[in-house]
């Protein structure tokens, strides 16, 4: 997901830091398919996150006593619906002016901010801790959702899990936290695909177990077109169906600017990624949120082609990677996805 260049919801989390008895240590408007939640719940024990559940020699997470809201009226894929935008750890202008950036996002009709916390080769769970908290507070004031995302390397699953849970548990002084968490699944740090898959699933199962059955989780997957057609040796045996069971939404990296040029080809590439996920998860009807871009390289007409396909394919949401590169022409096209 990273560029190739130098009172918020806490669903199903019975969180009380320091409380005893914690658990052990590249389709807009469609409805969630009937029975999906009940079948998942049967497979996932409800988890309880607490400070003792993650070994930590890093900065402790605050407990503000924020209220856990009722779960009955909240959909698992809700944070992923509609128009979103992405911030990674290299978007320095956002980190320097977080509140102003959120204000601008809201003015452009953004519903959800996808915010990177860290990655596997950093030595802390939050690269920009103050900026993360400022964005969470500003987003809460403007009614925007915020989804945390993290890039694991799978070489150290314990660290990847620890950092994921730190994101889920994070609270600002005002009591605000992330609305969901999404795992960025693309790193080839572990060279053997079979080992990489085993560790991905071990990490994903641990995240689901700790977060609980109702907490919304997203799987950010490398371009399905690449995984299945143009570079099948990159990750043979990619576990599409198991991921669709563990996560509530799939977010394919549909970076057509790496592969094609022009609005028609951008539309074609976007359609391919959606169709491949639906084929690989046949019968599961997994919700899809398409991540387009790269914004720094895309044109206005290409963005229109992307949007046209997103609307035609009935995904639950779409976004562009990343926010600072989105031009006025791109915004004009993207606004129709609100």
Regions found by a protein language model. Name each.
Residues 115, 178-189, 235-268, 321-326:
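Aromatic- and acid-rich polysaccharide-binding/catalytic face
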Residues 90-107, 158-174, 231-243, 299-309:
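Short, acidic/polar
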Residues 85-90, 145-157, 200-237, 284-297:
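Aromatic-lined carbohydrate-recognition surfaces of secreted/lumenal glycan-active proteins
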Residues 20-21:
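C-terminal motif of bacterial Sec signal peptides marking the signal peptidase cleavage site
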Residues 247, 252-263, 280-338:
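Substrate-binding cleft of secreted/luminal carbohydrate-active enzymes
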